[in-house]
Regions:
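Individual alpha-helical transmembrane segments in multi-pass integral membrane proteins
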Residues: 2-91, 102-114
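Membrane-interface transmembrane-helix boundary segments in multi-pass integral membrane proteins
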Residues: 102-105, 164-187
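PAS/PAS-like sensory domains across diverse signaling proteins
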Residues: 227-228, 238
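Hydrophobic transmembrane alpha-helices
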Residues: 139-168
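PAS/LOV and related PAS-like sensory modules
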Residues: 206-227
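Conserved hydrophobic beta-strand signature of PAS-family and PAS-like sensory domains
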Residues: 229-233
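Juxtamembrane or sensor-core-proximal signal-transducing alpha helices
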Residues: 119-125, 178-208
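Alpha-helical transmembrane segments of multi-pass integral membrane proteins
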Residues: 7-15, 77, 126-149
């Protein structure tokens, strides 16, 4: 139970950082040819939205433990992708007017949400690597399809009367932030793995201790799961 919650938080933060980093790495390659920068508060809010909505989606999938919970949780994660993207675009300051194609905006939201809805049912179908990889690929497809469709919806008309805020974050500093985010994802994954290994070792030691106590008993002991015998102690085995 405890490790389940730990992995939920680790997964939410690492996935949220991954979604956020993917968007802003793509934004670093986007050059409108006029001065631009990023509003710090909205950039931070876009990261928080990605993490919180990913956590909410994963929690729904785990708590509901049903097909509906998995699909709805995946849709929430997909909605988090769209929320993060448009908050990130709201943070983008440029010396010009930003125009949006409403049809492509709606299409981008639907793509992210619908493909995201398929990612959790696939990734959490069972513990096999095949479905884990399938879920990861679907989540990647949700991120990429949303991002490129959404970027196709934007047009920028240069306007020299509009100025970028002096407090806006330049692209070079954003690159540093993305690098830190990527490093954080790796650290969180390693930390979660270390905690999981420690918990498994503790469980194994506790099982060995209980087995030793059972074998020390004079009476024969039999542990069953329904009609199936799971284990017996030495006294029962000699009967």
């Amino acid at each position: 139970g405890h490790m389940r919650h730990v992995w939920l938080v680790v997964s939410a933060i690492s996935t949220g950082f991954g979604i956020w980093s993917t968007h802003f790495i793509a934004m670093l390659a986007f050059s409108p040819g006029i001065p631009s920068g990023y509003n710090i508060a909205l950039t931070a809010l876009s990261l928080a939205a990605a993490i919180v909505l990913t956590c909410a989606g994963l929690a729904m999938a785990m708590v509901q433990n049903s097909s509906f919970g998995l699909w709805f949780g995946g849709a929430v994660v997909g909605g988090g992708i769209a929320t993060m993207h448009y908050l990130g675009m709201a943070a983008f300051e440029v010396e010009g007017t930003v125009l949006w194609d409403p049809v492509l905006v709606v299409a981008s939201i639907l793509l992210g949400t619908l493909i995201g809805a398929t990612a959790l049912p696939a990734g959490l179908r069972d513990a096999s690597m095949k479905w884990k990889v399938t879920g990861s690929l679907l989540l990647t497809a949700a991120i990429c399809s949303h991002h490129f469709t959404a970027m196709g919806a934007v047009s920028i008309i240069p306007d020299p009367t509009m100025k970028v805020s002096p407090n806006a974050l330049p692209s070079t500093w954003l690159a540093v932030g993305v690098a830190i985010a990527s490093f954080t994802v790796i650290l969180l994954a390693l930390a979660g793995l270390a905690l999981d290994i420690r918990d498994q070792r503790r469980s194994a030691l506790e099982a060995d201790r209980m087995r030793g106590l059972a074998n020390a008993a004079v009476e024969g002991l039999l542990v069953c799961d329904g009609e199936v015998a799971v284990t017996v102690n030495h006294s029962f085995a000699t009967l």
